[in-house]
Amino acid sequence: MSKSEHNLIWIDLEMTGLDPERDRIIEIATIVTDANLNILDEGPVIAVHQSDEQLALMDKWNVRTHTGSGLVERVKASKIDDREAEKATIEFLEKWVPAGASPICGNSVSQDRRFLFRYMPELEAYFHYRYLDVSTLKELARRWKPEILAGLKKQNTHQALDDIRESVAELAYYREHFIQL
């Protein structure tokens, strides 16, 4: 498969919290799929260095989750800053999708986009202005066909690459069991 405007860019960020004015990106990963959700390639998974002072601002949930996954140690050991992570991610995406072609894809991606806008604006601008947010279908299924949610199993590791793989699989599940295409 080659570069195509029909390919989709999936992204997930792990952050120190939910407020882009205070919190920071600590991990970024991307996956490119074709329009039928077949994974074409996985981009770099990058732990983004943040200071001990920044990490100390995390709440209990983030400390527990990101320490338990090993991400905090990876962030402390990383030499890669926001700009370097942004550049490496764009270099990967340029091989698969023209700039401005793909919506930003994933779960609750408006939150990711807020952080990209603040800390990785060139990457944020690489996406089309539209969103393909799997959490929209999750909310609709919860209200209109809740019985299908029992068949959806997620690990919720809160590791960026795992989360993206689960988002792609979740959309494929909804396509088959909810949208029924």
From Swiss-Prot:
| Name assigned to this protein | Oligoribonuclease
Question: Per the UniProt entry, what are the Gene Ontology biological process annotations, in alphabetical order?
Answer: DNA metabolic process
Keywords carried by this UniProt record: Cytoplasm, Exonuclease, Hydrolase, Nuclease
- The active site consists of Y129
Name the GO cellular-component terms.
Answer: cytoplasm
Q: What is its EC number?
A: 3.1.15.-
CDD domains for the chain: Orn (cd06135)
Domain (Exonuclease) ranges? 8-171
Any transmembrane segments, and where?
none
This entry's Gene Ontology molecular function terms read: 3'-5'-RNA exonuclease activity; nucleic acid binding
Its lineage opens with: Bacteria, Pseudomonadati, Pseudomonadota, Gammaproteobacteria, Enterobacterales
Q: Where in the cell is it found?
A: Cytoplasm
In terms of Gene3D superfamilies, this protein maps to: Ribonuclease H-like superfamily/Ribonuclease H
Q: Is the Cytoplasm keyword given for this protein?
A: yes
InterPro entries in the cross-refs: Exonuclease_RNaseT/DNA_pol3, Oligoribonuclease, RNaseH-like_sf, RNaseH_sf
Q: What class of enzyme is it?
A: hydrolase
Q: Which gene encodes it?
A: orn
Q: What does this protein do?
A: 3'-to-5' exoribonuclease specific for small oligoribonucleotides.
Q: Which SUPFAM superfamilies match?
A: Ribonuclease H-like
What family, per the record?
Belongs to the oligoribonuclease family.
